[in-house]
Regions:
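A glycine/proline-hinged amphipathic helix-loop "lid/cap" segment
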Residues: 1-99
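A fold-wide structural signal in alpha/beta-hydrolase
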Residues: 110, 139-143
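Short beta-strand-to-loop junctions in surface cap/lid or active-site-entrance loops
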Residues: 96-109
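Short beta-strand element of the alpha/beta-hydrolase
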Residues: 108-117
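Catalytic nucleophile-loop/oxyanion-hole region of alpha/beta-hydrolase
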Residues: 123-124, 130-131, 143-178
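Primarily recognizes the serine-hydrolase "nucleophile elbow" in alpha/beta-hydrolase
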Residues: 164-204
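A generic structural signal for alpha->beta connector loops
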Residues: 78-81, 94, 139, 176-178, ...
Length: 204
């Protein structure tokens, strides 16, 4: 319960307010100013016995974050309506690939996007506004993958889902040469891992 409260409280605080709070109390480490958001996060959150965190607590944390991200709308939204189509990579419809198509598309290239969250948190829905905004600004179709999360799904589940997404796109006559990989935080790591995977495949 305490963890959920702290997450909700932390997500409600605007960045500009955090910077004002910390402006007269800067921490300097190795000649660098410590990021105010990180400083507040460390201050608010108690040391957690991570081995005692249960799956139910993780699910509650996910739910709290998703609720805040979707209700607060902290990302910029596109000016024009973006067409969104949900595709599924499996028969059980457990792996979602959401397609974003802007009003005007400049080229045949597409972006395959992976959300961040330490492979444990977030989803296509927490990053929905952000990806739609990018699609409009870049005038490019973007596919956002809702890969399976840990700890329920062990490594390499997320990577396998990402491989499935590329194969699905290729089945739709989209050349791999026209696919750019992109992600934030853990999503960036997944994009790099996927690149490494296909680079090794090409060497075989």
């Amino acid at each position: 319960m305490l963890l959920n409260f702290l997450v909700n409280f932390y997500l409600l605080i605007p960045v500009w307010l955090i910077k004002i709070i910390c402006i007269f109390n800067k921490d300097i480490k190795r000649e660098y100013i410590f990021d105010p958001q990180s400083k507040l996060l460390i201050y608010l959150f108690p040391k957690l016995e991570l081995q005692n965190v249960k799956n139910d607590e993780i699910k509650n944390l996910r739910s709290a974050i998703e609720k805040r991200r979707t209700n607060l709308r902290i990302s910029k939204k596109p000016k024009k309506e973006i067409k969104k189509v949900d595709h599924y990579l499996d028969k059980d419809e457990s792996i979602l690939l959401r397609e974003y198509s802007p009003y005007k598309v400049d080229n045949k290239n597409i972006i395959l996007f992976f959300h961040g969250g330490g492979y444990v948190l977030n989803s296509v829905f927490t990053h929905d506004d952000m990806v739609a905004y990018f699609s409009e600004k870049l005038r490019t179709r973007i596919f956002s993958l809702d890969y399976k999360l840990a700890p329920e799904n062990k490594f390499p589940a997320a990577l396998e889902n990402a491989i499935q997404a590329v194969e699905w796109l290729e089945d739709k006559n989209i050349s791999s040469a026209n696919i750019s990989l992109c992600g934030d935080s853990a999503g960036g790591h997944l994009a790099a891992s996927l690149t490494h995977h296909f680079t090794n495949e090409d060497k075989k």
